[in-house]
Amino acid sequence: RYPYTGVLGILSAEDHEKVRSAMELVHAWDLKDRDFSAVSDGQRQRILLARAICQEPEVIVLDEPTSFLDIRHKLELLSILKEMVRKQHVAVLMSLHELDLAQKVSDLVICVHGDRIERCGVPEEIFTDEYIRQLYGVTAGSYNASFGCLEMEPARGKPEVFVIAGGGSGIPVFRQLQRQGIPFATGVLQENDVDYQV
């Protein structure tokens, strides 16, 4: 809040309230008396986000904000950011390498390859198997746009197992067989069946 404090850098009651509100928003108020160097990386991420929020910015730029966060805190953080965009009209620019999160949370995606912008568009235009393969140079496996995840390449060779699947019942079996390197076949699946996509 120091940009708002004047020459002497004295925090007013309003400044203290803004800091408290920002820390509560990111679930970091319980860390207020802890030494910053003694908290976990995930807790540091939340504290730094609170620091940015209490400045009341029009734009927040975040570099890998979900790094070091567990699943719960990733979801909380992304929900907080989406709420800020909707309610406070803050523009959030962030770099993410987690394609599944970027696909679900972004309004607009800018893909950077090397030192240049490769492509820009809405998630539905960007997150396709063909484009993700091209962007990352993926030669084995595939990108499943429906699930927002990478799929391992199936084991090659004559199928040793036939999996009777459908309605998602085959996915855990497919993945277990892939992990074990066992070639398999499945059927009969409709193209709109979730098992077909995997």
Task: Show which residues each predicted segment covers.
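Conserved ABC ATPase "signature" region
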Residues: A13-K32
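Conserved ABC ATPase signature
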Residues: G9-L11, D35-V39, Q43
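Conserved catalytic motifs of ABC-family nucleotide-binding domains
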Residues: E56
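Catalytic Walker B motif of ABC-type/P-loop ATPase nucleotide-binding domains
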Residues: I60-E64
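ABC ATPase nucleotide-binding domains
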Residues: G137-Q197
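Helical segment within the ABC ATPase nucleotide-binding domain
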Residues: L75-K87
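Hydrophobic anchor residue at the start of the ABC signature
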Residues: L49
